[in-house]
A protein has these predicted regions:
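Membrane-interface segments of envelope glycosyltransferases acting on lipid-linked substrates or membrane lipids
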Residues: 1-155
Length: 155
């Protein structure tokens, strides 16, 4: 069995989270299991169901500029601690770079950067997000972009 580690903000009932749970409910969990790195320090709507389905929830130190070194170490240690984790799938847009880099440092061979939209929120982290967006894309192994009906890819 392999484990896919998803990096998300939290597992409340949002679009990305609900999509992931729909996949999780219908995959063959004897072959593939989902685990989640969450960045918000509060219980989430899907936590109990994730555990019931066999998944793990790893509480990160937070994806905040003050915690980036600790976050990198956390991801690296999480991946290294369970050799069944074979894939990291970052759903954090530009900030997914930190999960991808931590997984790379742990030697993980399959790293996916998944941007669910093209908009980057202009908050206090905006300059850092702009700095991270291209490295996040190129830190993933293989790239694919789909915008409406047009696709561009290098896999």
């Amino acid at each position: 069995m392999i484990r896919v580690l998803h990096s998300v903000s939290n597992m409340d009932r949002g679009g990305i989270e609900t999509m992931l749970m729909n996949y999780y409910r219908h995959i063959d969990r004897d072959k593939v299991q989902f685990d989640f790195i969450v960045n918000k320090k509060k219980p989430s709507d899907y936590d109990d169901e994730i555990r019931r389905l066999g998944g793990h929830i790893y509480q990160s130190p937070g994806l905040d500029p003050l915690h980036y070194p600790a976050y990198l170490r956390f991801v690296q240690q999480t991946v290294t601690a369970d050799p069944r984790i074979r894939i990291l799938h970052a759903h954090n847009e530009a900030m997914g770079l930190y999960a991808l880099k931590g997984a790379e440092k742990a030697g993980l061979q399959v790293r996916i950067a998944h941007a669910h939209n093209i908009w980057i929120v202009r908050d206090y982290k905006w300059p850092l997000k702009m700095f991270c967006i291209l490295p996040a894309f190129f830190n993933a192994l293989g790239q694919a972009i789909c915008m409406e009906c047009n696709t561009v890819g290098r896999i």
